[in-house]
């Protein structure tokens, strides 16, 4: 089976979502009949998020397609200090950047910081689909842009089976409690479309599953 696996958070970095992605990829790749392609965000080696050790744990059979998050995304991404002298100033800059990102995310990052990536990656995914003729597509939430990327591919290939993974709620996540009504309505239109186009769902908790069943 040829699988297109879409995840913003991949084994290029080290967080809980990337570890989940790593486990899924490795378990899928160890099945002899499977050919797994990963479509993900580019986290350069000089990014503070890049983790060579986690990446080394990824099954070498997985084919990676790494797409840039865009010029703005790569510009504001915190970088590793280039030398020892720069460590303190780098840490101060890192704290400043993080605080600014938190303030700005709710304004410019809708639904998240990877939306521009989703648009670019979906175009790459469409070309990949034409070439590879995938049997199934799998996308990982969090963040929502993984699903948005997959949604755009699904719109082009309506017969492609699409499995969506939900680690947390989207709109009802605690980080979105105070978003504006306009933004809520905008994001809900995406969430509804993703749910309507999905063929299969994987939920981490029964409560989350029941909420989506009741909502959609």
What is each stretch, according to the model?
Residues 2-3, 136, 151-173:
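Active-site proximal beta-strand in glycosyltransferases
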Residues 41-119:
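A conserved catalytic-core segment of Leloir-type glycosyltransferases
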Residues 109, 121, 125-146, 160-163:
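Short N-terminal targeting/anchoring amphipathic segment
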Residues 139, 203-204:
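Short beta-strand scaffold positions
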Residues 145-148, 152, 182-201:
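Membrane-proximal helix-turn-helix segments that form the acceptor-binding/catalytic region
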Residues 161-163, 171-193:
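Nucleotide-sugar donor phosphate/pyrophosphate-binding loop at the beta->alpha transition
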Residues 196-197, 202, 209-216:
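Helix-loop-beta element that forms the nucleotide-linked donor phosphate-binding surface
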